[in-house]
Curated annotation (Swiss-Prot):
GO terms for molecular function: 3'-5'-RNA exonuclease activity; magnesium ion binding; polyribonucleotide nucleotidyltransferase activity; RNA binding. Keywords: Cytoplasm, Magnesium, Metal-binding, Nucleotidyltransferase, RNA-binding, Transferase. This is Polyribonucleotide nucleotidyltransferase. Involved in mRNA degradation. Catalyzes the phosphorolysis of single-stranded polyribonucleotides processively in the 3'- to 5'-direction. Its cofactor is Mg(2+). GO terms for biological process: mRNA catabolic process; RNA catabolic process; RNA processing. PROSITE patterns: KH_TYPE_1, S1. It comes from Shewanella oneidensis (strain ATCC 700550 / JCM 31522 / CIP 106686 / LMG 19005 / NCIMB 14063 / MR-1). It catalyses: RNA(n+1) + phosphate = RNA(n) + a ribonucleoside 5'-diphosphate. The gene is pnp. Residues 621-689 form the S1 motif domain. It is found in: Cytoplasm.
Length: 699
């Protein structure tokens, strides 16, 4: 074994890259560490591409092992199962910036596996995973236009912080991840507390500048440990076939893209492609139809991009900065706690909000520790939304990613647990889609939350921006269609309020995206966002004054913390009886806070009355209605409050002499008693004869 190690300082931490010891049969394997957080990254690529393949089969698998945090997995099998939501999101985070760095035409299968083998609870594993992946690809010999750098940027007390710790992120107004090459930013993912556009742009530039140390270190690591580059050359286009296809299809594509309705346009594009293929097959029956499909796609892309760059109207007839027609409806479903239907052009989201108690919150046990998530947002993209058939089942990677982006956009305006003691689940059903469905989910979520009476700080809207760039010419597009996303050079999603940005996601397919272009995109996005917010506020401008009649109402009371055990009872018997008999949900906290949830106001009042009974102190001199629970020779024990019994001595039963207690009292008999004394040991002395006056009894 011949280990090769490269170490360098990066922000507050030391980063170490090591190869040559572990997983030596992979094309490349790097053990990457940042502090005590360590990941093993392996890369394997197939030397030959499958014949006729027309896509690049890159797979990124990110897996967190519980042993990394010194834990044993839960569940019956006691081993790791399918990827968690967090693992899926980090896999996407790694995939997005590396995918565009593989050369065009490269169709060989590549698999990247990142395994977290040690974790420091203060250092998240995502950044070192991205760095380790970049290093492994750099030394693998697989064609890759890297290296790639990655950085997390925080914003604390008006200053940017490089790779903040978990504790620092908690105090930060920004949590942004940026990845890029030496000359270009490729990917941004962020969550922010409504920060101004200039702060967001500054954080991207700061992160890209700081990660140059990573890019330089990986280049040096590659020089020392890199394998020979594969002998691979990009396939050469058949220029004669390209010319034939242009002659057969260009005019048809130009005409088809005059059609503004998506389904009609798609039908006409299909006609143009079918006619071109038919003509080519007639001339040459041996023509490669897969190559023809690829070349038709390239021509289609050039036609659309050329129209935009020449200043012609967009596919649906809009100008570059125009937002599609909006339709906003709140309260569209009668029995949900909150609902909204948000439509922007041919993109539509039906969004619902459900309120629950604290026990409905999501409990997450990851290698970074346990946490509770009171706000959940789930995004569903059924096949009918794009007029197709398909599998319906558990959420795919894309649905998880889009849901998390919408969650980030909204989270900054959510109320605290003290302001609003409910768990909140939002579901966005995409019922129509033609671009920017995740941002439609942000808008719909804001509306549904307000309809449910959730006191969010202000409305939030989201917009997707696009870019078409050739040389020095570029056009920034607002509210992009699905086709513009597919054919363009950038997908730039911005969510925020009137005051600032709450989430920013950017994926760039080309180099040369300058600070100027990002600045224009952010400013154009701000104008579009304000326009959408104005329309949304006309439908519902602030949260409803009260929650839905169908939602559980949570009432909070305080009791003496020492009385919590009395409310719970032996083996939970008391609280179980309380919840079953009143039909409420009751939650207790260590500080004596009691939360009673029910959609029935009378049930809540009854639960409060009984809890107050259980926790109230016995008062000397007060009269109570009680029940005889035990008879002894010297008197009777009477229950006066839940869990509170007292003794009526034989001498205190009547003014007359009592020879036998059973002659005057029987079990379960209701009697009125007066508290005469509570001694130091908490024993209660009662009297029936002293309570014979007309004083009202305590229930």
């Amino acid at each position: 074994m011949n280990p090769i190690v490269k170490s360098f300082e990066y922000g507050q931490h030391t980063v170490t890259l090591e190869t040559g010891v572990i997983a030596r049969q992979a094309d490349a394997a790097v053990l990457a560490s940042m502090g005590d957080t360590t990941v093993l990254v392996t890369v394997v690529g197939k030397k030959e591409a499958e014949a006729g393949r027309d896509f690049f089969p890159l797979t990124v698998n990110y897996q967190e092992k519980t042993y990394a945090a010194g834990k044993i997995p839960g569940g019956f099998f006691k081993r790791e199962g399918r990827p968690s939501e967090e693992e899926t999101l980090i896999a996407r985070l790694i995939d997005r910036p590396i995918r565009p760095l593989f050369p065009n035409g490269f169709k060989n299968e590549v698999q990247v596996i990142i395994t977290v083998v040690s974790v420091d609870p203060e250092i998240e594993p995502d950044i070192i995973s991205m760095i380790g992946t970049s290093a492994a690809l750099a030394i693998s010999g697989i064609p890759f236009n890297g290296p790639l750098g990655a950085a997390r940027v925080g914003y604390i007390n008006g200053e940017y912080v490089l790779n903040p710790t978990v504790k620092q992120i908690g105090a930060s107004q920004l949590n942004l991840v940026v990845a890029g090459t030496e000359s270009a930013v490729l990917m941004v993912e962020s969550e922010a507390q409504a920060l101004p556009e200039e702060v967001m742009l500054g954080s991207v530039v700061y992160g890209h500048d700081q990660q140059q140390v990573v890019i330089k270190a990986i280049a040096e690591f590659k020089a020392e440990a890199g394998k020979p580059t594969w002998d691979w050359t990009a396939p050469v286009e058949d220029e004669a076939l390209v010319a034939q296809i242009k002659e057969l299809a260009e005019a048809g594509f130009i005409e088809a893209y005059q059609i503004q309705v998506k389904q009609e346009r798609y039908a006409q594009v299909a006609v143009v492609k079918a006619a071109a293929k038919e003509a080519l097959l007639a001339a040459n029956p041996d023509v490669d139809l897969r190559e023809v499909d690829n070349l038709l796609g390239s021509l289609e892309k050039k036609v659309v991009r050329g129209r935009i760059l020449r200043g012609m109207p967009r596919i649906d007839g809009r100008e570059p900065d125009m937002v599609r027609a909006l339709s906003v409806l709140a309260g569209v479903l009668p029995r949900t706690h909150g609902s909204a239907l948000f439509t922007r052009g041919e993109t539509q989201a039906l969004v619902t909000c459900t309120l629950g108690t604290e026990r409905d919150a999501q409990k997450i046990d990851s290698i970074m520790g346990e946490r509770t998530n009171r706000f959940m947002l789930h995004y569903n993209f059924p096949p009918y939304s794009v007029g197709e058939t398909g599998m319906v089942g558990s959420p795919k990677r894309r649905e998880i990613g889009h849901g998390k982006l919408a969650w980030r956009g909204i989270n900054a305006v959510m109320p605290s647990a003290e302001e609003f003691p409910y768990s909140v689940r939002v579901v966005s059903e995409i019922t129509e889609s033609n671009g920017s469905s995740s941002m439609a989910s942000v808008c719909g979520t804001s509306l549904a939350l307000m309809d449910a009476g959730v006191p969010i700080k202000t409305s939030v809207a989201g917009i997707a921006m696009g870019l078409v760039k050739e040389g020095d010419d570029f056009v920034v597009l607002s509210d992009i269609l699905g086709d513009e996303d597919h054919l363009g050079d950038m997908d730039f999603k911005v969510a925020g309020t009137r005051d600032g940005v709450t989430a920013l996601q950017m994926d760039i397919k080309i180099e040369g995206i300058t600070k100027e272009i990002m600045e224009i995109a952010l400013q154009q996005a701000y104008g579009a966002r304000v326009h959408i917010l104005n329309v949304m506020d006309q439908a519902i401008g602030s949260h409803r004054a009260d929650i839905s009649d169908h939602a559980p109402r949570i009432t909070t009371i305080k009791i003496n913390p020492e009385k919590i055990r009395d409310v719970i009872g032996k083996g939970g018997a008391v609280i179980r009886a309380l919840t079953e008999e009143t039909g409420t949900t009751i939650e207790l906290e260590d500080d004596g806070t009691v939360k009673i949830a029910s959609s029935n106001g009378e049930a809540t009042k009854e639960a409060i009355r009984r809890i107050e009974e259980i926790t109230s102190e016995v008062e000397v001199g007060r009269i109570y209605n009680g029940k005889v629970i035990r008879i002894v020779d010297f008197g009777a024990f009477v229950n006066i409050l839940p869990g509170k019994d007292g003794l009526v001595h034989i001498s205190q039963i009547s003014d007359e002499r009592v020879a036998n207690v059973s002659d005057h009292l029987e079990l379960n008999q209701e009697v009125t008693v007066k508290v005469m004394e509570v001694d130091r040991q908490g024993r209660v002395r009662l009297s029936i004869k002293e309570a014979q006056t007309k004083e009202p009894a305590a229930e």
